[in-house]
Amino acid sequence: LSQAALEGRDILFDQNGKYNLVIRRMLETVYTDYQGNRADADFVNLEIYLKRVWFSNGIHHHYASDKFVPAFTPEFFRTALKNVDAAKLPLADGETVDTLCDRIFPVIFDPKVMSKRVNQADGEDLVLTSAANYYDGVTQQEAEEFYNALKNPADDQPVMFGMNSRLVKENGQVQEKVWKSGGLYGAAIDKIICWLEKAFEVAENEVQRAVIEKLIRFYKEGDLHTFDEYSI
C-alpha cells in the first residue's frame, strides 16, 4: 500500500501546479550534481527551498496556498543549471537551458505569477487565478456550467463531480479528462493498480480485500459511485 501511494506522488505534484514537476527536476538536478561550494548561501537556500517543495508537493504552501519565495538568486540558479548535464534537465523539444530558464523562472521568482495555489478572493475568477492544475483554459463560469449540467436532481446518491478529473478546452469545447487507467495519469495509475493488486493478495481478511478491490475498480473505471462505495 505504501508503494502504491509512492507511485502517485508525481500525480499530486502535477495536480498542485502545472510546472511543479519541471521545477522539482531542475532543483533536484542542481542539488545532486552541483560542483560548487555547497556552503555558499545561494546553494544552502536552494536546498531549503527544495525541501519545502518536497514537503508541500509543489511550490505553494500546503495549507496557506501562498507561493514560496526563494532566497537564492535567479543568476545563481541559471549558472548552476548551465553547469550540470543538460540531459538530466526537463528540456522540451528544441529547448536550451537558457530558454528553459526563461520559461520557468517567472513561475519561481515572480511573486505575481501563479501566486496562489488556490485563490478564494471574492470577486475574482477562482479558476483562472488559481495555480492548481485542475483546469486548463477554462473559466470559473464554464466549469460551474459544465458540472451543473451533469447533476441529476433526482439522484438520491449524488457524486462529487470533478473530484477525479481535469477540465480542458479543446476546439472551443470544455471536456473532462478523467484520472484512470487508460486516461489522464494512466501510466502512473497502472502502477498504483499493480501494487494494490499485490496488497489484495496479502490482505489479512475479507474486509480488507473488499476495500482494496473497490479502490482497484475505481482506478480502472474512474466511476465516482465506486469511489463513494470505497469511502463508505
Predicted regions and their residues:
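Active-site-proximal, well-structured secondary-structure segments within enzyme catalytic domains
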Residues: 230-232
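Segments forming glycine/polar-rich beta-alpha architectures that bind adenosine-containing cofactors
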Residues: 192, 208-216
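N-terminal helix-rich structural modules
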Residues: 1-163, 167-177, 183-201
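Glycine- and small hydrophobic-enriched segments that form the cores of compact globular domains
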Residues: 223-226
